[in-house]
Amino acid sequence: MQGGSSGIGYGLKYQARCISDVKADRDHTSFLTGTLSLKEENEVHLLRLSSGGSELLCEGLFSHPNEIWDLASSPFDQRIFSTVFSTGDSYGAAIWQIPEPYGQSNSSTLECVASLDAHVGKINCVLWCPSGNSDKLISMDEQNLVFWSLDSSKKSAEVLSKESAGMRHSLSGGAWNPHDVNSVAATSESSIQFWDLRTMKKNNSIERAHVRNVDYNLKREHILVSADDESGIHLWDLRKTKFPVQELPGHTHWTWAVRCNPEYEELILSVGTDSAVNLWFASASSEHKTSESPVEASRQRVNPLLNSYTDYEDSVYGLAWSSREPWIFASLSYDGRVVIESVKPFLPRR
């Protein structure tokens, strides 16, 4: 099914790849996004959906010194977020605080809370502990996981532990398990690795080539969703990982990211380099799948795609559900176009 141009758009000044839901903002539907300009001063935009839901407003515009490759908002403080950035061939990661007061009339300077300077190689991402009130975070480069404790009042971050994934694996990203704060999934060229943060050791893995992105289902404890380089999407039951419990066709080119809805367990979003955002209906349960009749199972496999949003002219890399209004999501294409959409017409009946 092809979607129309019903989304609310906002244009960034430069190219961009990352957008994050501001989970700690309980009063507004808000998103943070950052630009990726090689020659110009980069920007972080704080965007809020108007109370009537008809406009996407820039509530804050902040200068950022480097190209932003990853951005994640703190789950416990709406003014704090992390970025991974590059300057030429070198990479860095830092925690930032939005100054008060702020506005869009001119570009304000962000306050650096802490530098995550325990890396020597290319840094890929920063993950915040999903508990919402924790000061713990993880940063990953291609070879290492670093576990941090953040003290924003003292403007410092302390390394609690650091571990190498081994020379055979090149880490590319990951997701923190919302059901078990001691567990993190890390993606690599050849597998999904599961790490126990208490011991900083791998305790399990899914051997699957070229996994690009993963996300946990917030409503189903054992379900993980992965996006693969060959364009497909797979749902895994972590209690039995030999085969996926469901496969979705993904995108016509690379599937770049997948996100499970924070409230509706059957809904999954994906974005890709085919300039599309796809909304999927997935059972997300091996028990559910095996209990279906052959006709029901066949119908679900044939048409799991609820809608395809095609308001884009470039590859779509950024994707975030709103945690405050879980029927709303934001997507970001490489040309700097942010689009807000509602999936209300596709919500499952309860």
From Swiss-Prot:
Supply one GO CC term from the record.
Cul4-RING E3 ubiquitin ligase complex
User: Which terms are listed as keywords in the entry?
Assistant: Abscisic acid signaling pathway, Nucleus, Repeat, Ubl conjugation pathway, WD repeat
Associated pathway: Protein modification; protein ubiquitination
Q: Where in the cell is it found?
A: Nucleus
Please cite one Gene Ontology biological process associated with this protein: abscisic acid-activated signaling pathway
Specify where it is mainly localized.
nucleus
Q: Where are the WD repeats?
A: 39-79, 118-158, 166-205, 206-246, 250-290, 311-350
State the phenotype upon gene disruption.
Increased sensitivity to abscisic acid (ABA) and salt.
**What is the top-level taxon of the source organism?**
Eukaryota
Kindly state the subunit structure of this protein: Interacts with ABI5 and DDB1A and DWA1.
| The protein's role, per its UniProt record | Component of the CUL4-RBX1-DDB1-DWA1/DWA2 E3 ubiquitin-protein ligase complex that acts as a negative regulator in abscisic acid (ABA) signaling. May function as the substrate recognition module within this complex leading to ABI5 degradation. Functionally redundant with DWA1.
- Protein name per its UniProtKB record: WD repeat-containing protein DWA2
